[in-house]
Regions:
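Active-site glycine-rich loop that binds ribose-phosphate moieties when present
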Residues: 95-96, 155-170
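Conserved small/polar residues in nucleotide/adenosyl-binding loops
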Residues: 182-188
Length: 188
């Protein structure tokens, strides 16, 4: 069996851990895993312009301890759809056809999509054209309706809390100081 994995949307802690876990579990079952670079955009690979890599347990060992994602991630491009609750986005038919061609060329039996609300909406559209898809919810915003908490959120909260604690110590050491901590704007 051949399965694909991609990260889509914004970066968050835990993406590499998912990749390592997928590759390890697949390997124990005798399956092959292809990782797509730059989210869904990697699905638009053409012969000679491969935007993917066949992943091995040896090549992924230790990833869970590293931030970011070895595959890269994109929240714009050919697959970017913004939808509200209960609304459905669309992807250009030519993009879907190129996606089907890549899936067929690689002999993929399924695709694992690690992403937030927009990414999971795109995954649904791919499932509707016949590609078996497994969605792994992730978001630092914790705004996915079907989950209580997603990975990425707890890590983001912990890092912001620790940063605030450190800033408080610095601010208390000086009589006239204003400290600002900038974080992601979930509205973007």
């Amino acid at each position: 069996m051949n399965i694909g994995v991609l990260n889509s949307g914004g970066d968050c802690p835990g993406l590499n851990a998912v990749i390592e876990g997928v590759v390890g579990a697949a390997s124990r079952r005798g399956w092959n895993v292809v990782g797509f670079y730059d989210g869904f955009e990697g699905l638009l690979s053409e012969e000679g312009d491969d935007r993917f890599e066949w992943l091995t347990p040896a090549g992924c060992r230790g990833l869970r301890a590293k931030g970011g994602t070895i595959l890269g991630t994109v929240n714009k491009g050919n697959f970017a759809i913004k939808v509200g609750v209960g609304q459905k986005g669309e992807i250009e038919p030519a993009v879907l056809e190129k996606t089907k061609a890549t899936v067929k060329r690689l002999g993929l039996d399924a695709l694992i999509v690690v992403g937030g609300d927009g990414s999971q909406s795109t995954a649904l559209l791919l499932a509707e054209i016949g590609l078996p898809v497994v969605g792994v919810p992730k978001t630092i915003d914790n705004d996915l309706g079907a989950t209580d908490v997603t990975f990425g959120f707890n890590s983001a909260v912990a890092i912001v809390s620790e940063s605030l604690d450190r800033l408080e110590t610095t601010a208390n050491a000086h009589q006239r100081m204003i400290c600002l901590l900038y974080t992601s704007d979930a509205a973007d």
